[in-house]
A protein has these predicted regions:
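Aromatic-lined carbohydrate-binding/catalytic grooves of carbohydrate-active enzymes
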Residues: 239-337
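Terminal connector regions
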Residues: 215-243, 250
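Short coil/turn motifs at secondary-structure junctions
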Residues: 76-78, 216-217, 329-331
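Primarily single-stranded nucleic-acid-binding OB-fold modules
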Residues: 168, 182-183, 252
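Polysaccharide-binding surfaces and accessory modules of carbohydrate-active proteins
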Residues: 2-179, 195
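Short Pro-Gly-centered flexible turn/kink motifs
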Residues: 199-217
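Short, structured beta-strand/loop micro-motifs enriched in basic residues and often containing a Trp
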Residues: 184-196
């Protein structure tokens, strides 16, 4: 496809919700959006002004193979404005027939789910009146829970694909909806209805959404490859050969003693495994469970009275590289900090 029609969707508290039976399902297509007028557009952005005194700048900056999208909302009024929804990206006038999503949970593999829009009841209504919508996302601090913050749509006749990834480490949502024929794809922070998100913006202040990246290609694999490369992953040279890592958690279940680790090291010697990683429990305090003291990261004197050097030297003696497990973002109830 040669061009994409980038747009924006937002909802200011106090304005009417959208019509066509969308209320309660989505905050898109609201009065806030319809009170806006496109005042300028160029290759990088669309600028909208509202009759109520807001200015919205929807960026879609081309960077390499992708478009980097985000939205800036400026409150140019004399009153505090509460945003209940605002998109990081929105693309309109789409003619596609298949939706691709990636599903997963904690401690699970990602799986691609591909569905025809007809299987999702996304055909227009007989009168064209009722909006059809497929909305998904997750609420909480786990960016991937049930769904990846990713979507791709496909026109199977033309072999056209659009892929999107949200850079949103919090509650997020993605929506595909149609009113009559054209489809609209949008996403960003979870709205007030879905994720109880809102943002108060004082007079002469602004709010910038998290970013999204958008890729266009002739296969699902290509657009996914573009989205990954857009992250500019910094791959360490030690990972270039995809070394095999053995994590010992399922052998000691949070009790990684020297004796347990040596039994494992003996089994792994000469197997082609490069790393032996000691998992949870190496820091646990006496008479406490390993999950109750996460956060202090003090070496257990009971498990390792001579410190970690002794166990590290033992692991190395079997031709393995020692590793250690942390969850630096976690603090448990019985930790000292």
């Amino acid at each position: 496809m040669n061009t994409m029609n980038f747009s924006v969707q937002f909802k200011v508290r106090g304005d009417d919700f959208g019509g066509h039976f969308i209320n309660g399902i989505s905050m898109a297509d609201s009065e806030s959006f319809w009170k806006c007028k496109l005042v300028s557009a160029d290759d990088d952005k669309n600028v909208y002004e509202s009759a109520d005194g807001y200015k919205i700048i929807a960026y879609h900056v081309k960077k390499g193979d992708v478009f980097e999208c985000y939205t800036v909302f400026e409150n140019n009024t004399d009153s505090v404005v509460t945003l209940d929804m605002i998109s990081s990206f929105a693309i309109t006038d789409l003619d596609f027939d298949t939706l691709h999503r990636a599903t997963s949970f904690w401690s699970a593999e990602g799986k691609m789910l591909s569905q025809k829009l007809t299987d999702l009841n996304m055909e227009r209504s007989w009168s064209g009146h009722g909006i059809r919508i497929e909305k998904f996302g997750q609420v909480g601090s786990m960016p991937v829970r049930k769904w990846f913050p990713f979507v791709a749509i496909e026109n199977s006749e033309k072999n056209e694909f659009i892929g999107v990834q949200l850079y949103c480490p919090s509650s997020w949502q993605i929506e595909l909806f149609r009113y009559k024929e054209p489809l609209t794809l949008l996403g960003g922070l979870a709205d007030f209805d879905y994720g109880h998100w809102c943002k108060e913006i004082k007079p002469n202040e602004s709010f910038t959404t998290p970013k999204a990246v958008v890729a266009v290609g002739d296969s699902l694999l290509k657009v996914c490859d573009m989205l990954v490369k857009a992250q500019q992953p910094d791959i360490s040279p030690v990972d270039e050969d995809l070394p095999v890592i053995f994590n010992e958690y399922c052998t000691s279940w949070g009790n990684p003693t020297i004796e347990n680790l040596e039994k494992t090291a003996k089994k792994l010697q000469g197997s082609g495994v490069k790393y032996l990683v000691m998992d949870s429990g190496w820091y646990k305090e006496e008479d406490k469970n390993w999950w109750e003291t996460i956060g202090d990261w003090n070496v257990s004197k009971k498990l390792f009275p001579n410190g970690l050097k002794e166990v590290n030297d033992m692991i190395k003696s079997y031709g393995l590289v020692p590793g250690i497990w942390f969850e630096m973002e976690n603090v448990a109830p019985l930790s000292q900090i």
